[in-house]
């Protein structure tokens, strides 16, 4: 997330799609109409695959594979003061890499739904996390940005779609 915002700040990108842990006061933004669910990606043959969903307390003691951004932003809020039983064995920047680690049996990857293939033949599956906030998504751009005509057209389309 930080890399994307840096590129936006330097003018290398016109727009970015980000989650709710960006300082929205720094940018103009449009909230997207969809929200994503957090969950656990694991091997399809894992004994815990029988569970339909997980709570944060279910994660304590499990070998967790987490997004680097999640560890920095959401992690402290979810576990509050109970950090002693949390076992993060790896972090990832790309969801695909987290899924590969989970498929290899390294642990349980925490990620948003629909970021990786969890269909029947994939070898992994997704189980939702209960009682955690959904991830809200935003289209952001620099304040006082002067757009090219095509970027201006895209902004107009985005505004019409999300309002």
Could you say what each language-model-derived stretch is?
Residues 62-84, 147-151, 155:
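Secondary-structure junction motif
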Residues 45-55, 131-133, 144-150:
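Short helix-loop capping/hinge motifs at secondary-structure junctions, enriched
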């Amino acid at each position: 997330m930080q890399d994307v915002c840096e590129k936006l700040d330097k003018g290398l990108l016109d727009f970015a799609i980000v989650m709710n842990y960006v300082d929205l006061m720094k940018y103009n933004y449009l909230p997207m109409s969809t929200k994503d669910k957090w969950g656990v990606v694991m091997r399809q043959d894992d004994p815990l695959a029988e569970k339909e969903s997980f709570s944060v307390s279910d994660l304590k003691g499990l070998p967790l594979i987490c997004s680097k951004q999640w560890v920095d932003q959401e992690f402290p809020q979810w576990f509050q003061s109970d950090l002693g039983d949390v076992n993060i064995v790896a972090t990832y920047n790309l969801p695909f890499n987290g899924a590969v680690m989970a498929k290899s049996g390294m642990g349980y990857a925490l990620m948003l739904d629909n970021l990786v293939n969890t269909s029947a033949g994939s070898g992994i599956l997704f189980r939702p996390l209960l009682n955690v906030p959904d991830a809200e998504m935003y289209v952001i751009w620099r304040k006082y940005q002067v757009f090219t005509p095509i970027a201006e057209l895209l902004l107009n389309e985005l505004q019409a779609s999300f309002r």
